Design a protein with these regions (language model features):
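N-terminal active-site segment of His-dependent metallophosphoesterases
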Residues: 1-110, 211
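Solvent-exposed loop and beta-edge segments used for protein-protein assembly and interaction
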Residues: 10, 117, 212, 333, ...
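Conserved hydrophobic helix-helix packing surfaces used for dimerization/oligomerization
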Residues: 16, 179, 374-375
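Structural beta-sheet core signal
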Residues: 18, 58, 125, 218, ...
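Alpha-helix termination/capping residues and helix-transition junctions
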Residues: 50, 210, 239, 369-371
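His/Asp/Glu-rich metal-coordinating catalytic cores
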Residues: 55, 67-292
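Active-site C-terminal subdomain of aminotransferase-like
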Residues: 282-285, 290-308
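Accessory, non-catalytic peripheral segments of nucleic-acid enzymes
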Residues: 299-415
Length: 415
């Protein structure tokens, strides 16, 4: 199952756009950032059409909350209807019973096989921890979109103590694809289920044709990065027959899949498409990925998102700047920090121009089109330095930054 540099589109090649953690609806009532999430979700759908993919696979947290507003529903439904409902022919076949994998009460088959709607580019999605199922009927926002024929919600978990992961099986020419999904389960509960042997992954039945090969693609939405006090699902807990795993939940975007030397599976931490915190991982480039699969070979192409609001972060240790830690020096410290923020704003604007350089070169964009950036200056002020109130300081940059109340973060070194 080697990764190759490129696979040509063709009758034997699955082309799949991978995305996760879109968090549609995040800060939707903010006057500056309110449209960010659905603007980027629309860009992702545009990319899928431009790349002529067979399907989109989404790894959880499509919505930021499990009870989205009418505004969030409207923008997602509009985008899916504009992009997924089309005359593009479906070039693959579903060769398994989808009812177990989709586990819905109604319409237990993918939308592209419903004669009442014309789906040409389906989206397959699992629930994350933000848009998980709740209520008496355990309904997720994805169930609403699924029953409307706008996406396919799969990987549902009905009983956290007894989980069976059943794949959707597809065929395209000489290539066979098994698509697995496991929606977000609290780590402690999932680890207990694993330890008791009650998590089962069903493999495709090859008894009728022992020579048939399946490319096994898995979507999961769990903690992946070790942090103090945080439980994670280890990659080695997943079955060894998996070929590729789209790992949702973590927002840091890694530019390529990494092979696990024990299981042999390639793990892609695709990251979020919008910054939901002012943390270092959110400053990385935001990408979606086109996964091409032919037989057991695959290639993964990152595509940078251009609509993402630029985010620049910087750390300053005042004791290393040469500034004196005296009360009479407060003005000089303030001016130094203001200068740092102004430089960061300039850097953010350059990042936007670089990411959208073709539009600038073609005259489709100008300087005024650059969005207000996200800026976070982390200042370590141990040693007796006097600094301005963080909110007062941040409000100096109204009209220049998007996060007008939390530009600066002061902290002291732990002893």
């Amino acid at each position: 199952m080697p990764e190759v540099s490129h696979i040509e589109p063709g009758p034997d090649t699955f082309r799949i756009l991978l995305t996760t953690d879109n968090h549609v609806g995040y800060m939707e009532n903010d006057q500056i950032r309110g449209d960010d999430s659905w603007r980027t979700f629309a860009e992702i759908s545009d990319i899928a059409r431009e790349q002529d993919v067979d399907m989109i696979v989404q790894g959880g947290d499509l919505f930021h909350v499990n009870a989205p507003s009418k505004k969030s529903y409207y923008h997602v439904m509009r985008t899916l209807r504009e992009h997924c409902w089309c005359d593009k022919p479906i070039e693959y076949k579903l060769v398994s019973d989808p009812s177990d994998a989709m586990a819905t009460k109604h319409f237990m088959y993918p939308a592209e096989y419903d004669s009442n709607v014309n789906v040409g580019m389906p989206l397959y999605a699992i629930s994350g921890n933000h848009d998980d199922a709740t209520g008496e009927e355990l309904l997720s926002p994805l169930d609403v979109l699924s029953v409307a024929g706008l996406l396919n919600h799969y990987g549902r978990v009905i009983d956290n103590e007894q989980i069976t992961v059943c794949p959707l099986l597809f065929n395209k020419g000489e290539t066979n694809l098994a698509l697995y999904g496991l929606h977000s389960v609290r780590e402690e509960r999932l680890m207990k289920t694993m330890a008791s042997g009650n998590l089962e992954f069903l493999e495709p039945d090859t008894s009728a044709d022992p020579g048939i090969q399946w490319f096994n693609l898995m979507c999961i939405h769990q903690n992946h990065v070790h942090r103090p006090g945080v439980k994670v699902v280890e990659e080695t807990c997943l079955p060894s027959f998996l070929d590729f795993v789209l790992w949702g939940h973590e927002h840091d975007c890694h530019p390529s899949a990494v092979r696990n030397d024990i299981t042999g599976a390639y793990i892609l931490q695709a990251g979020s498409s919008i910054a939901t915190s002012l943390s270092e991982g959110e400053t990385l480039d935001k990408n979606v990925f086109v996964l091409s699969v032919k037989g057991k070979d695959f290639s993964s192409q990152p595509i940078r998102l251009k609509s993402v609001r630029p985010f620049v972060m910087k750390d300053v240790v005042l004791s290393q700047t040469g500034l004196s830690a005296t009360s009479s020096n407060k003005k000089e410290v303030l001016n130094f920090l203001i200068m740092q923020v102004e430089l960061m704003i300039g850097k953010a604007n350059e990042i936007w121009k670089h990411n959208n350089r073709k539009s600038f070169e073609d005259g489709l964009m100008g300087e005024s089109d650059a969005p207000l950036p996200l800026i976070r200056l982390r200042v370590e002020y141990s040693g007796g330095y006097e600094v301005e109130n963080p909110r007062f300081f941040s409000n100096r940059f109204v009209g220049k930054v998007a996060n007008i109340n939390d530009v600066v973060l002061y902290y002291k070194k732990r002893r």
